Amino acid sequence: MSFLSYLISGISLGSIYAIIALGYTMVYGIARMLNFAHGDIIMVGGFAIFTMVSTLGMAPMVGILAAIVVCTVLGVTIEFVAYRPLRGASSLAVLITAIGVSYLLQNLALLIFGSNARQFTSVVTVPGLKLAGGRLSISGETIVTIVVCIVIMAGLTGFINKTKVGQAMLAVSEDRGAATLMGINVNRTIAITFAIGSALAAIAGALLCSTYPSLTPYTGSMPGIKAFVAAVFGGIGSIPGALIGGIILGVVENLSKAYISSQLSDAIVFSLLIIILLVRPTGILGKKINEKV
């Protein structure tokens, strides 16, 4: 496998991290909280698609749409039941609640589906490409993942900058009190943010499980943590930062597996986080804020 192959597959992995990181960065940017249950919503999306496609025999696209609906409803429910009552609470209380929700989702999946890994059937039907006389192979999953990431980033940027709901999100992220005085329903805006983030988690789950087709109740844990690292690296609260952080993280992880050690790749990724926090605590594109996480 050539350097270019590792680079392209790293960009593909980074695109998945970027899509997941968007959920972290949107929720933090608007609600000023870290939803550490976000990675487990990815797992829920994966199991929803698995159930729809492999168990019920539905078409892959129908399974993906169903998973998006399931994850969206789940995300809004979590926000309403677990996080909204803690709106004025300390960051520590919110953090502990988020960790509790994460364990709850994992254990529910363990109870329903068991601990054995399920073989996930790829929902990608796009054929791969062979370039450079067949020396460079790009899988259909890689192509779809990169394209979907670009479309999501462009669409989400346009949505936030061009729509009333997006403008409301920007207003709430800047000053929640002033947004309330302007007549913006803050609770509804935050709920919409959770809905969008959870829908993106479902899409990320489909892409992740298609690329790495082993599904367990803990499938979303490590990708969720790495996506959080990507969000912090790029500047949590920044949509372009999520993309930059995700791509850099994916490429670094893939190249370190190829040329250094697959066992040390995670250590290298987290070392990168420590370095960026020491050099630039707000991340590459992050802005300094007054609140503490």
Predicted feature locations:
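Membrane-interfacial amphipathic/re-entrant helices at transmembrane-helix boundaries
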Residues: 1-20, 48, 60-63, 89-93, ...
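Transmembrane helix-bundle core of multi-pass membrane transporters
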Residues: 86, 91-162, 189, 255, ...
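Alpha-helical transmembrane segments within multi-pass membrane transporters and channels
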Residues: 24, 57-101, 108, 244-245, ...
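Helix-loop-helix "hairpin" substructures at the membrane interface of multi-pass membrane proteins
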Residues: 13, 135-215, 239-245
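Hydrophobic core segments of alpha-helical transmembrane domains in multi-pass membrane transport
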Residues: 46-51, 67-74, 99-109, 146-157, ...
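Membrane-embedded helix boundary and interhelical linker motif in transport proteins
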Residues: 8, 30-77, 81, 86, ...
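Short, non-helical or kinked segments that cap or interrupt transmembrane helices
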Residues: 15, 24-46, 60, 88-93, ...
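Transmembrane alpha-helical segments in multi-pass inner-membrane proteins
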Residues: 17, 57-69, 194-271
